[in-house]
Amino acid sequence: MAAQKRTLVLVPGSFNHIEFYIPLIEKFTSETGYPLHTVALRTVGKKPGPLPTIYDDAAFIASEVEKLADDGKEMVLMGHSYGGIPISQCMEGLSLAAREKEGKKGGVVRIAYMTALVPAMGENALAGLEGCPTGYTETDEVG
């Protein structure tokens, strides 16, 4: 029996609906044959009630990843842009190794950051941008 292909779990950037990624999703799945699962961030779009936070995004990502892991999926968790922050935040206990220690199947085998913010544990996005130029950047005729 052939080994099961790993599932790519794509977490979008801030202000990005999953629909923006449809061309990427279609090309990736058709050319590689790998399954791809997307996670819509709680912080994207207008919803009633209090504004969701990064922690709401991380908790939702963790719940989606856990469902896939419980189905035996081995995953590469990929965050684009802002998505790098909540995927970093949500990883505790979701790695394949951590789940195997608990007698569970499935889990995250790799984390991938696609032009994403990669904070250290407990660090916020602004700390990760420390030292970068701020404000408006002038451009000339060549960019």
Predicted feature locations:
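Alpha-helix termini
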Residues: 1, 32, 68-71, 93-105
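Outer-membrane beta-barrel proteins
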Residues: 75-76, 115
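Flexible "cap/lid" loop of the alpha/beta hydrolase fold
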Residues: 96-143
